[in-house]
C-alpha cells in the first residue's frame, strides 16, 4: 500500500481560527460546563434522590397467611441475605412498613383484615402478591377463598409458584425497586386543577386479561 505524506502549512489562512470558531474548543467547554454545573430543574434531582432512597430501603410488613410466608422468611437468612437490597427490616406495625407481601391463601374472612392493615399503611405503599393462592386462588377454587388478592387490593408485583422460592421473592424486590425508580409522581395522590384526588390505577391482572385470554396453547408441566 502506498502512502502520501502532505505537509501542513501552519501559516495558511485556512488553519487560522478563533476560539469561538473552533468547534472542538466549543465542545470541550460545553462538556466542562455540563460536568460541573447542574443546568436542570431542582425538583427533578430531588425526585430522583427520593426515588433512590425509597427503592433502596423497602421495609416489609411482617404479615403471612400460609406456606408462602415460610419461603419469604427464608430469604432473610444468611444464605440469601436480603439485607443487600435494604429490605431486611421487618416491621411489626403497618404504619412503619413500605410494602405488604400477601404470602399465602387470602380467605374471605381474612380479606377485611388485610384491607384494614393496608389502609393503615402510610403513603407511598406497595403490594406484592406471592404465590399462586394470592395471585388467583391457586388450587382452592372454593367459596371460602378470594380468587386473587387484586380483587380488593392494588397489586404491584406478582410472584408465580406454589410456593415460590426465596430467589423469586428477591427478584420481585428488584422489580419493585425498578418500578419505584420509574414513578413520575412521588405519591399516589395527585394535585391537579380540580383539587387533590387519588389515582385510579388499574391492576396488571385486569390490564393483561384480554391478552392472556387469547392464549390457546398451554405447555404441559413436562415442558416447563
From Swiss-Prot:
<keyword id="KW-0472">Membrane</keyword>
<protein>
    <recommendedName>
        <fullName>NADH-quinone oxidoreductase subunit B</fullName>
        <ecNumber>7.1.1.-</ecNumber>
    </recommendedName>
</protein>
<dbReference type="InterPro" id="IPR006137">
    <property type="entry name" value="NADH_UbQ_OxRdtase-like_20kDa"/>
</dbReference>
<feature type="binding site">
    <location>
        <position position="68"/>
    </location>
    <ligand>
        <name>[4Fe-4S] cluster</name>
    </ligand>
</feature>
<dbReference type="GO" id="GO:0051539">
    <property type="term" value="F:4 iron, 4 sulfur cluster binding"/>
</dbReference>
<feature type="binding site">
    <location>
        <position position="133"/>
    </location>
    <ligand>
        <name>[4Fe-4S] cluster</name>
    </ligand>
</feature>
<dbReference type="GO" id="GO:0050136">
    <property type="term" value="F:NADH:ubiquinone reductase (non-electrogenic) activity"/>
</dbReference>
<keyword id="KW-0479">Metal-binding</keyword>
<dbReference type="Pfam" id="PF01058">
    <property type="entry name" value="Oxidored_q6"/>
</dbReference>
<keyword id="KW-0411">Iron-sulfur</keyword>
<feature type="binding site">
    <location>
        <position position="162"/>
    </location>
    <ligand>
        <name>[4Fe-4S] cluster</name>
    </ligand>
</feature>
<comment type="function">
    <text>NDH-1 shuttles electrons from NADH, via FMN and iron-sulfur (Fe-S) centers, to quinones in the respiratory chain. The immediate electron acceptor for the enzyme in this species is believed to be ubiquinone. Couples the redox reaction to proton translocation (for every two electrons transferred, four hydrogen ions are translocated across the cytoplasmic membrane), and thus conserves the redox energy in a proton gradient.</text>
</comment>
<keyword id="KW-0874">Quinone</keyword>
<dbReference type="GO" id="GO:0009060">
    <property type="term" value="P:aerobic respiration"/>
</dbReference>
<keyword id="KW-1278">Translocase</keyword>
<dbReference type="GO" id="GO:0005886">
    <property type="term" value="C:plasma membrane"/>
</dbReference>
<dbReference type="GO" id="GO:0008137">
    <property type="term" value="F:NADH dehydrogenase (ubiquinone) activity"/>
</dbReference>
<comment type="subunit">
    <text>NDH-1 is composed of 14 different subunits. Subunits NuoB, C, D, E, F, and G constitute the peripheral sector of the complex.</text>
</comment>
<keyword id="KW-0408">Iron</keyword>
<dbReference type="GO" id="GO:0048038">
    <property type="term" value="F:quinone binding"/>
</dbReference>
<dbReference type="GO" id="GO:0015990">
    <property type="term" value="P:electron transport coupled proton transport"/>
</dbReference>
<feature type="binding site">
    <location>
        <position position="67"/>
    </location>
    <ligand>
        <name>[4Fe-4S] cluster</name>
    </ligand>
</feature>
<keyword id="KW-1003">Cell membrane</keyword>
<dbReference type="GO" id="GO:0045271">
    <property type="term" value="C:respiratory chain complex I"/>
</dbReference>
<keyword id="KW-0004">4Fe-4S</keyword>
<dbReference type="InterPro" id="IPR006138">
    <property type="entry name" value="NADH_UQ_OxRdtase_20Kd_su"/>
</dbReference>
<comment type="similarity">
    <text>Belongs to the complex I 20 kDa subunit family.</text>
</comment>
<keyword id="KW-0813">Transport</keyword>
<dbReference type="GO" id="GO:0005506">
    <property type="term" value="F:iron ion binding"/>
</dbReference>
<keyword id="KW-0830">Ubiquinone</keyword>
<keyword id="KW-0520">NAD</keyword>
